[in-house]
Amino acid sequence: MDFSSIEQNLNNFKKLVAGNSDKAQITPVLVQLKLAATIHLEKPTSLSNVSDKVKKDLVLAREILELISLYSIKIKDIDSFERTFNQLKTYYYDYKSIIAPSTLEYQIIGLNLMRLLAKHKTSEFHSEIELIEFNNLDNSFIKFPLLVEKSITEGSYNKIIQSRSGVPSEYYQVFLDILADSIKEDIANCSEKSFKTLSLKDAEKVLLFNDNNQFQQYIKERNWKVQGDVIQFGNNDNQTVEIPSLQLIHQTLHYAKELERIV
């Protein structure tokens, strides 16, 4: 596959994604682009005396991987995003001395930071931060996940909440949704360990459900028993509760409410 054919496939991919085409149309083009980025486009054997042709191939391969990573988030295929980002790291860090930075670089690095936060991979988050040059930590795409991480650590979540416009790009919403769902699970687990009963009204409010049907479905998924208007958790009086229930629930509820304002 020659360079012009790869460019043509990439332009076709952009049009299909922008037009919200279905996966059946996009997948064949996507497969061809993945092959192009990994096999057909040339990589340097060393970082010295790199030819213009190889540099041109690197830039195109990077763009392909960047657009695939954003598409992966769009269709909520987080595993695909992770795999593609790991490929991109070579272009962002190893090849930075031979090709100019991409305009999408910090957005995608920031999205990976959000992925790590959403998956509770704190140590990996800090390892990735160490790879970023200090003067780029104030980049809006990097600053947002840093503020989210700081707020999680401190519990002062209001610091990151200003308005929806505070989110650097629409792709960040996907990871905020994952994080919000994770918080709901934490609240539910905390409630089960801390209380013998909880009213349906309070539970729906605490878990931030705006749709009662979804709330009822969640109750079924958790196998909670409902008697009248009360959820029975069935805790034993002698059960040791290691979680400071009210404090954690109130703190987590505040955090979840603030995240809901972003989402």
From Swiss-Prot:
What Gene Ontology cellular component terms go with this record? nucleus; proteasome regulatory particle, lid subcomplex
| Keyword Lipid biosynthesis annotated | no
Q: What are the alphabetically sorted keywords of the record?
A: Developmental protein, Proteasome
Q: Which domain of life is it from?
A: Eukaryota
Where does the secretion signal sit in this chain?
A: none
Extract one GO BP annotation from the record.
proteasome-mediated ubiquitin-dependent protein catabolic process
Where do the PCI domain residues begin and end? 79-248
UniProt key word Endoplasmic reticulum = no
Coiled-coil region(s): none
Family of this protein: Belongs to the proteasome subunit S14 family.
Function description: Acts as a regulatory subunit of the 26S proteasome which is involved in the ATP-dependent degradation of ubiquitinated proteins.
What is the protein named? Answer: Probable 26S proteasome non-ATPase regulatory subunit 8
Q: What is the organism of origin for this protein?
A: Dictyostelium discoideum
* Lineage, top ranks: Eukaryota, Amoebozoa, Evosea, Eumycetozoa, Dictyostelia
